[in-house]
Every structure is written in C-alpha cells, then in structure tokens.
Design a protein with these regions (language model features):
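Hinge-like oligomerization/junction regions that interrupt long coiled-coil arms in large cytoskeletal
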Residues: 2-195
Length: 200
C-alpha cells in the first residue's frame, strides 16, 4: 500500500511487516482512525506526530521492530501496543459551551479493537468551531485540557496557544478523506453514466 507522507522509519517497518518479517504490526494510527473531511484538519492537528505512531499487538512486537530499526539504522518510531494502551476520557463536560463541536475521540471512526488507542490519543481533546470559542472554553475550564479548532489552531492544556497557517489537505487524514470523497463521487458518476447508457 502507498505510504506517501510517512516517515522512512514507518515505511521500513511496514515493508518488513508486509513481507512477514515483523509480526503483530497493525499499521500507522492515521490509517486506523478515520475522520470525515470537515474534521480531518482538527483531528490531524490533535494527533500531531502520533498520526505516524504504529499500532501493534504486544510489547514483544514493538521490541522486535525497534531492534530491526536499530540494527538497520532505520530511524525511530513510537509503537502503541494494544496490550498496554488504555484510553482516558475528559471528566469535564463542555458540551453546552458556545462553539463546542465535540470530543475529538467521538468525531472519528475506527474498528472496536482500536477504541483505547483513539481514546488515549483523542479522548482528552475538545474540538471547537474557532479560536474565540476555543479560548473561551479553555479559560472556563482552567486550561485543564487541549482545545483544537476546526482550522487547526490549538489552545494547549496549561494555556499556551499554537497556530498559524497550514496547507489545507496536506496531512495524512485530510489526504485520505479527500481520496474517499473522490472515490464516492467517481462511483456516483460511473452509476449515472451506466444509467444514461442503459436508457440511450
């Protein structure tokens, strides 16, 4: 499968896993967690570098892959063993606040086995409409959790702000959301073409 946009180290592990030399590797987080186009930039921002973390079954699988990377000078990867990772949820419930879109973990889809991964990476991040809403929510809750806007600006836990411009559609999730959207459009157009041909 195409791994454009991924780090060389991630590609190296996936290639070894693909040929059966490394077992228990499920793939990068950004391939296992799906976001619809409207939320893709916010979720990408919330994930940050974790989008390229590799999910595996157990510690042993991660250790084997790390040994491979070390021996081949293949770079570094963060592994998320399903046996270890436990999801955490936000205790606060800012759902009634102006501009609240949702908890990031609730705005993505994934297979049930990846629930703890999604919760651990996104369960304590709020998605808000814009920066004004994000700062208001963060301030009201004492900057206890991170708030990310739909256009990828961030109010970090603790109160620091991160933002600026980002290239729309450049991230791994945005790219996949766009591909899925185009594939659906292509399917619709193919069906319409067939229908037109049949009635002609």
């Amino acid at each position: 499968r195409n791994l454009d946009g991924f780090a060389q180290s991630v590609k190296a592990v996936m290639k070894e896993a693909g040929r059966g030399a490394l077992r228990g590797i499920h793939g990068p987080v950004s391939r296992l967690i799906h976001a619809q186009a409207d939320y893709a930039l916010a979720i990408e921002t919330a994930l940050g570098a974790a989008a390229q973390n590799l999910v595996c079954d157990r510690d042993e699988d991660a250790k084997r892959a790390i040994r491979f990377l070390k021996e081949t000078h293949g770079g570094r990867v963060t592994f998320l063993p399903l046996s270890n990772i436990r999801g955490t949820r936000l205790r606060e419930q800012p759902s009634g606040e102006a501009g609240f879109v949702g908890i990031a973990a609730d705005l993505v889809t994934y297979e049930p086995q990846y629930a703890d991964i999604a919760e651990s990476l996104l369960g304590r991040t709020v998605i808000a409409e814009d920066m004004d809403d994000a700062t208001a929510i963060a301030r009201k809750y004492g900057y206890k959790f991170r708030v990310v806007t739909l256009d990828g600006q961030v109010v970090n836990a603790g109160g620091s702000l991160t933002g600026g411009s980002s290239i729309k559609g450049a991230g791994l999730l945005s790219r996949r959301a766009e591909i899925e959207k185009l594939q659906a459009e292509a399917k619709t157009l193919t069906a319409k073409a067939k229908e037109a041909t049949d009635t002609y």
